[in-house]
Structures are given as structure tokens and as C-alpha cells.
Amino acid sequence: MACMTDVRVRFCPSPTGTPHVGLVRTALFNWAYARHTGGKLVFRIEDTDAARDSEESYSAIIDSLRWLGMDWDEGVEKGGPHEPYRQSQRKDIYQDVLKQLIDAGEVYPAYSTAEEVEERHKAAGRDPKLGYDNFDRDLTEEQVAAFEAEGRKPVWRLRMPEQDWKWTDLVRGEVEFKSFTQPDFVVARSNGEPLYTLVNPVDDALMEVTHVLRGEDLLPSTPRQLALYEALKRIGVAKVTPAFGHLPFVMGEGNKKLSKRDPQSSLFNHRDNGIIPEGMLNYLALLGWSLSADQDIFGVDELIANFDVADVLGNPARFDQKKLEAINADHIRLLEPKDFEARLRAYMTEYTEFPADYPAEKFAIAAELVQTRIKVLSEAWDLLKFLVTADEDLVLNEKAAKKNLKETAVEPLNAGIAALEAVEEWTTPNIEAALNKALIEDLGLKPRVAFGALRIGISGEAVSPPLFESMELLGKESTLVRLKATREQTPFVVAE
């Protein structure tokens, strides 16, 4: 494989289903390597499977990259010198290359059926499941004529050199496949339609891709692609053979490969749950790579400055939801307050029942109260919904109420109500001062005992944003209405 200076990588998904975290991790590593080296990222779409491909999936892939802030230098939606960038629009190109390969003798027609191949293996005492036996590569003209007379339509196979295949993988180091494991393989169907095994390397060659970074599942196909590249170079279609790097599997629970059926595999599930792009990007980068042994939190600029495919680990990476959320929490805290406020407002409006017309100045305060208390944006709803719930609709959490609204809670509730009724200017400092005096100083209660019943009374929950600030946001009237209603339910009895 040639040594290259101007890095050109590609991301070439098929538009099926929703974006998978493993797929997006592959896109991220290609993008980060292109940006780190000052190279180019080519984004093309492999949409030749009419039965499975969809425009909805295509749009979802575009949305996923844009959500994460990954751009591309050439490709769909952008254009470039190697248009078109959708395989469904490149069929004439593939037919032309296939014809050149046929004319040069690099590929040949193969008429054998699968049953005939198995029978030949059995007759020779070999495992019948060994695969194709290269029988048709040297058919005589008479044999070809006989097959044609039967009405057989051949598939087209590439002549694989009889040699062992060795290369230095960018991730895995020295890799070797023995020659007997690599029979001649099909590059075009019997109807002349080129297969992925042909069109993918042809696109890479024509788009001058220098580094192929892809999933570990494609490792066994590399010898075939290396052989095809040699053939493409001989007919003048390819200039060089790219370097290959095979990225580690992403594993799910129980050390099984993360499948599309796993909820954790869907990028948009994480987005909809309130993972922010910075947190997702950071975590995806850790699925096979790390900045340093003692630093898990980093931004996109640090990723670009430090990412090298040579540092990617070959071992499988396990997807850990708790770690993703912990990293996301750090990135939420790193946001500027105004930025966080805007993102939270947009999220709450789209994904929750939080009203879009809630006063901006109050929302700014509420956002500040929860920024350090949530791991994902969706958690803000449970913390803030009490602010937009009608007083008469507030429901007390039974478990929390049973624990905190015992007979002993009547006294702090009465004292708290009396103290708050006397507050004239309804501000956090005044609320705090009044309650501290009435409950801590005068009654001698510990804060947890003093304020537990009040917190449940205004929010319905044992956990809420800071109590005094919450009361200010809620307003004096609603605060007192709720506390008096809570007093009427104390001691709290769980309904049968």
C-alpha cells in the first residue's frame, strides 16, 4: 500500500433504519482524522438496495451528523469534483469499470450453481461448505457454449491471486489471511448488476480515498478489496491502494455486539432523552480511543488536536449508559448559563408539557437552579413541572409524603405558613430569613426536618430545586395555597 500525504477518508452508510451509535462512531473517527490531518472527508451514500433503502433514513443520517456538528468536504448535499455521491446515480460508472475488468481478463463468467460446487467438494473429500472452488476460471470455449446453450446466465468473479494476504492495519497492526481462505468472489450478478464488493472499492478509487476506516466486521473482506485494487490499478482506474484501519466493535449488555434492536444503539433515543451533542461526541470518541489515561472529559477542539487512528484500540468497546450520562452531565455544567437556558427551553418545549409561554425571566432562574442537578435534559421536567402545575392539580409523591408528612410535620408546616404570610417582599433572601428564624431558631429543628415537609408541599416531591428559590419562582399565593393544602393532608395516609 502506498504512503500518502493528503489524507482523504470517507463515510459511506446505507440509508436503512435509524442512525446506530456504532455507525456514527465510525463517522466521528473518520471526521476527526480528516480534521486532525488537514485532510478531506467524503460523504457518500450506498443506496443500491431498493428494497431496504429509504429517503427517511437518508435524512436521518444527515440530521445525525449535523446534530453532532460533523461537516464534510465533498459529498451529498454539498457536491464536489467526484459527483454524484449516491451509488444509485453512479450505475453507468460501475458498468463501464466492469466492462474494462472483463475486457482485461480480470474477471470471468462463472456458471456453476451452489449445488454443483458442493458436489465437487464432496467428490474430492472436502467440506461441502468451503465455498466457491474456482472451477469456472479456466473454462474452455466449448464448456462456455454448453452452459450458454442451457440458458445459464453467469455471475462475474474476480480472479484472486493465489497468495497469502498480509497488510499493516492502522488499528490492528500486522494482519494475515491465507490464500486458501480467499476464493474468487462475485463482483456482478447474473443480470450484470455490480455488487457492493465491486462498487465500494471503485468509488474509493475514483474518489481517491487514501485511508479506509471502517468496522471490524469488514476485516475479512479486506483481502478481496486489496486484490480488486490491484486489478483496478492495472486497468488505470485506481492510482493507489488505500491504508485500511478496522475499528473495534461496540458491545452492549452481556458483552454482545450492540444491535440495532437495542434501545441504546439509537443515536436519536439519546438525543430525545436529553443527551447534548458535546456529551455524545465526547462519549462516542471514547468507544475505542482516549485522550489520556486520566482525562475522560474533552471538547471537540481537543479531540481534533489529538486524534490519531494509530491510537485507536483494537479491543471491543462496551457501551455504558451510565458513563455516557455522567459525561453528559459534565458537559451540561460546562455550558454558559445563557446557552444552557436556550437549549433547555427548546428541549422542554419540544419534548415535555412545559408551556412555551412561561415567562423568560423566571425560566432563566429555573434553568440556573437545575443546570448542576441534572445528567440529561429530560430530568429537568421532573424537577420543574411543579412550577407549571395548577395548585389544585399538584399530587404528592406517596412515598415521600408518607416519610416526611407524619404528625411531627404539622408544627413546622404551621410555623412555616405563618412566617411566609408575614413576608412582604417575596424574594429568596427574605423567604430564607423568615423560614430560618421560624423553624431553625425558634423551633430548634434541623434543616432536613424543618424543610422536608415544605419541599413536598410546594413541589410534591422529596427532591426539588433549592427550596427558597423555588418558592420565589412559584409565587407567594401558590406557595401558601399548596402548604395549607399539605397541612390538611398531614399526617399523610396512603389511600387504599
UniProtKB/Swiss-Prot annotation:
GO terms for cellular component: cytosol. InterPro entries: aa-tRNA-synth_I_cd-bd (IPR045462), aa-tRNA-synth_I_codon-bd_sub2 (IPR020751), aa_tRNA-synth_I_cd-bd_sf (IPR008925), Glu-tRNA-ligase_bac/mito (IPR004527), Glu-tRNA-synth_I_codon-bd_sub1 (IPR020752), Glu/Gln-tRNA-synth (IPR000924), Glu/Gln-tRNA-synth_Ib_cat-dom (IPR020058), GluQ/Sye (IPR049940). One of its GO terms (molecular function) is glutamate-tRNA ligase activity. Its EC number is 6.1.1.17. It catalyses: tRNA(Glu) + L-glutamate + ATP = L-glutamyl-tRNA(Glu) + AMP + diphosphate. A motif ('KMSKS' region) lies at residues 257-261. It comes from the Bacteria. A motif ('HIGH' region) lies at residues 13-23. It is found in: Cytoplasm. ATP binds at K260. It is an enzyme of class 6 (ligase). The keyword Nucleotide-binding applies. Keywords: Aminoacyl-tRNA synthetase, ATP-binding, Cytoplasm, Ligase, Nucleotide-binding, Protein biosynthesis. One of its GO terms (biological process) is glutamyl-tRNA aminoacylation. Monomer. Catalyzes the attachment of glutamate to tRNA(Glu) in a two-step reaction: glutamate is first activated by ATP to form Glu-AMP and then transferred to the acceptor end of tRNA(Glu). Belongs to the class-I aminoacyl-tRNA synthetase family. Glutamate--tRNA ligase type 1 subfamily. This is Glutamate--tRNA ligase. It comes from Corynebacterium glutamicum (strain R). The gene is gltX.
